[in-house]
């Protein structure tokens, strides 16, 4: 398989208001389905969105830093341990990627609560197409996980499996349960899955110091950062 890379045009940054971003995208002459090749790209800081594999390649900004949890060293804090215990009653099931109207309804409500007037909160056919393209298109080893409470859907995760870990693509959850901490529980659960499957890393995507949306990732310690093409620890994570 021949693999090449292209640089996109500049576009408004999703995380830092007023900034312009660019991405380097993977271009292949065939469908990228080899797990080892995909794992190498993830290890180099790439992420997946639908069939698109990319990493930031901005002119002057280097704020997007790939991070991962070394699961054997992960030490949950007191708050995380409480959240873990609180949600042990959730019914969790693994599925192949598929469209379900109940999942889509939860996704829409989550988007509208978090990203009002965003490009992903459309409830028409175009919105369903964006949902499928963003979450349900994959040529790698991907699966969908549902979390139910008393037969009510509470959370959905799309996750890629790698030879050396798990890489969550996207998670959305019930926005009308205040203080649920579903997102924190989800990372704790994925960390536990890595440990159970003897996978050393949970890849969390990008951490950005000046983005409040990304601050939660620094709550999971220790955390490794990809800096100058080397995975390393930092003495200051916040």
Curated annotation (Swiss-Prot):
Question: Reaction catalysed?
Answer: N-terminal L-glutamyl-[protein] + L-leucyl-tRNA(Leu) = N-terminal L-leucyl-L-glutamyl-[protein] + tRNA(Leu) + H(+); N-terminal L-aspartyl-[protein] + L-leucyl-tRNA(Leu) = N-terminal L-leucyl-L-aspartyl-[protein] + tRNA(Leu) + H(+)
Which E.C. number(s) belong to this protein?
2.3.2.29
Q: Per its record, what are the GO molecular function terms?
A: arginyl-tRNA--protein transferase activity; leucyl-tRNA--protein transferase activity
For this record, an example GO cellular component is: cytoplasm
Keywords on this record? Answer: Acyltransferase, Cytoplasm, Transferase
Q: What is its main location?
A: cytoplasm
Q: One biological-process term from Gene Ontology?
A: ubiquitin-dependent protein catabolic process via the N-end rule pathway
- One Pfam family for this entry, by name? ATE_N
Q: Where in the cell is it found?
A: Cytoplasm
What's its top-level EC category? transferase
Functional note:
Functions in the N-end rule pathway of protein degradation where it conjugates Leu from its aminoacyl-tRNA to the N-termini of proteins containing an N-terminal aspartate or glutamate.
Q: Which NCBIfam families match?
A: PRK01305.1-1 (NF002341), PRK01305.1-3 (NF002342), PRK01305.2-3 (NF002346)
The family annotation for this protein states: Belongs to the R-transferase family. Bpt subfamily.
Which PANTHER family does the UniProt record give? Answer: ARGININE-TRNA-PROTEIN TRANSFERASE 1 (PTHR21367), ARGINYL-TRNA--PROTEIN TRANSFERASE 1 (PTHR21367:SF1)
Put simply, this protein is called: Aspartate/glutamate leucyltransferase
What species does this protein belong to?
Answer: Nitrosomonas europaea (strain ATCC 19718 / CIP 103999 / KCTC 2705 / NBRC 14298)
Chain's gene name: bpt
């Amino acid at each position: 398989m021949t693999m090449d890379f292209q640089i996109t045009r500049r576009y408004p940054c999703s995380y830092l208001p007023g900034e312009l971003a660019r991405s380097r995208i993977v271009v292949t002459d065939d469908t990228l389905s080899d797990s080892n090749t995909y794992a190498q790209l993830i290890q180099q800081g790439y992420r997946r969105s639908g069939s698109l594999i990319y990493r930031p390649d901005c002119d002057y900004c280097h704020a997007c830093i790939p991070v991962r949890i070394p699961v054997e060293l992960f030490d949950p804090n007191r708050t995380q341990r409480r959240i873990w215990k609180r949600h042990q009653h959730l019914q969790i099931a693994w599925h192949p990627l598929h469209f379900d109207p109940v999942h889509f309804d939860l996704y829409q409500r989550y988007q509208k609560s978090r990203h009002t007037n965003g490009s992903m909160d459309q409830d028409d056919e175009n919105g369903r197409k964006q949902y499928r393209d963003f979450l349900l298109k994959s040529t790698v080893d991907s699966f969908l996980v549902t979390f139910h409470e008393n037969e009510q859907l509470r959370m959905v995760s799309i996750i890629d499996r790698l030879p050396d870990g798990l890489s969550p693509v996207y998670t959305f959850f019930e926005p009308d349960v205040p203080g649920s901490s579903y997102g924190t529980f989800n990372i704790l659960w994925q960390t536990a899955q890595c440990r159970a499957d003897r996978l050393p890393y949970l890849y969390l995507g990008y951490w950005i110091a000046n983005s409040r949306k990304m601050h939660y990732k620094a709550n999971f310690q220790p955390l490794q950062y990809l800096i100058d093409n080397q995975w390393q620890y930092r003495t200051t994570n916040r």
